[in-house]
Amino acid sequence: MIELAPDQLPPLARWFAAGAPGPAALAEHVPASGTGSWWADRAHAPRALAVACAGQVLLRGDPSALAPDALAVFDAHYVQAPTCFLPALRSAFDRIVPWERMLYVHQLPVAAPCPPRGVTVRRLVPGDAPALAALAPDAAWLHASWGGPAGLAASGLGWAAFQEDEVLAVACTYFRGSAYEDIACHTDPAHRRRRLALACVTALCQDIAGRGHTPSWTCSRDNRPSRLLAWVAGFRLVHEYVHYLTGQPARCGAVPGSPAAHPAAAVRPGDTKASPGGTPRWRGRDSVR
């Protein structure tokens, strides 16, 4: 596939439904935020279209229009696509691993828990970028959809629990759509089980509702802590789906110019890739315990 410039994009309404919850909001988030990239089988009158951001990909169109290795640019990504794309994915990579996912929508208002003494929950501001950057490296996925710590801090769409200048927990809009905002949260492992994530998520949900939008939440079926937090925060299950973690290109080696070559795709907001032994581990948007 070839990468499209913003002025080369076809009308998106026929490709992606507007106002959809969960990862479908990615297609609206990319043009609004300026992060991510668009790909097609050809620039003029494309038959297959992909949008990628922060290690996630949405595929639409006619897979028969793709060359056998056309999707190899999306190695080490989480791909959501109609089942008709599975043969094309299998031919492009040495393996694809299905992940069962659960999509929740916020339905019940929840009272915010009182933060512990010395902890303040507030909206992120541009000056908080250094504090976000100081989070552990395995939390870098949190701001990938905003192009980095500065992008998330300046977006005005994140809430964090602070102890002095240290970020203990963060909840933020990950993909912002026209009706739904798919959210993510992370708590420093040393500060889990203090209800900090719940405090941040509750504040974020109130903020999103104030914009006239609805929060959504996605996580792995196997991640009970994430599912429990979603339930306690007032989210309810509305849909289950599968996305696919891609392996290495079938022809081996990273594809030059692929999204995986960029820092934003270095960590992925899903369950994480399979470990070297082949056993998947939790990580990314599920690291909310």
Task: List the predicted regions and their residue ranges.
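Short amphipathic alpha-helix that is part of the acyltransferase structural core
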Residues: 1-23, 109-146, 257, 271
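Conserved GNAT acetyl-CoA-binding A-motif
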Residues: 74-83, 208-220
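Conserved acetyl-CoA-binding loop-helix of GNAT-fold acetyltransferases
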Residues: 65-69, 193-207, 228, 232
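A conserved beta-strand-loop-helix scaffold within acyl/acetyltransferase catalytic domains
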Residues: 147-188
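Active-site rim helix/loop that mediates acceptor-substrate recognition in acyltransferases
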Residues: 21-34, 138-162
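Acyl-donor-binding surface of acyltransferase catalytic domains
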Residues: 24, 33-128, 244-245
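Conserved glycine-rich acetyl-CoA-binding loop
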Residues: 180, 185-199, 222
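Conserved active-site alpha-helix within GNAT-family acetyltransferase domains
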Residues: 86-96, 198, 221-239
